[in-house]
């Protein structure tokens, strides 16, 4: 099983609607309550024998993200061997097109060291 498959499996324990990269076309009538994860960058070590991959998990909720959901997502991701929490989570806000509904997005970074170039 690939790392992306393992991440998806863990996140689906929190929310059944999980996307990789970006959310696919969602109908305006569907609640925007889902999770998206993606890779941001790959950084090599100084000795070039390993590298670190930075992942982001974006929790998207109409209106607001319930208290405790951030901690649940973090706990699930940290169950993956070698996964570490990044330094700073950020919140962003937007309006769902055609509805006027507020949408809150929480971006949580994680890193995973891997052997090899």
Question: Over which residues does each language-model region extend?
Answer:
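Short, charged interaction patches at domain edges and termini
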Residues: 1-9, 26, 40-52, 89-117
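Small/polar-rich, solvent-exposed N-terminal microdomains that initiate assembly or binding
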Residues: 1-45, 62-65, 69-72, 98
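Aromatic-residue hotspot detector
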Residues: 37-39, 81-83, 110
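Short, charged/polar low-complexity linear motifs in solvent-exposed/disordered segments
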Residues: 54, 63, 85-86, 104
């Amino acid at each position: 099983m690939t790392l992306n498959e393992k991440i998806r499996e863990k996140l689906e324990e929190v929310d059944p609607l999980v996307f990789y990269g970006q959310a696919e076309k969602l109908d305006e009538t569907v609640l925007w309550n889902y999770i998206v994860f993606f890779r941001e960058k790959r950084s090599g070590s100084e000795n070039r024998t390993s590298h670190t991959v930075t992942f982001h998990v974006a929790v998207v909720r109409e209106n607001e993200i319930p208290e405790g959901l951030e901690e649940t997502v973090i706990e699930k991701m940290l169950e993956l061997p070698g996964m570490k929490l990044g330094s700073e989570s950020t919140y962003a806000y937007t309006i769902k097109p055609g509805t006027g509904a507020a949408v809150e997005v929480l971006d949580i970074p994680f890193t995973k060291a891997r052997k090899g170039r």
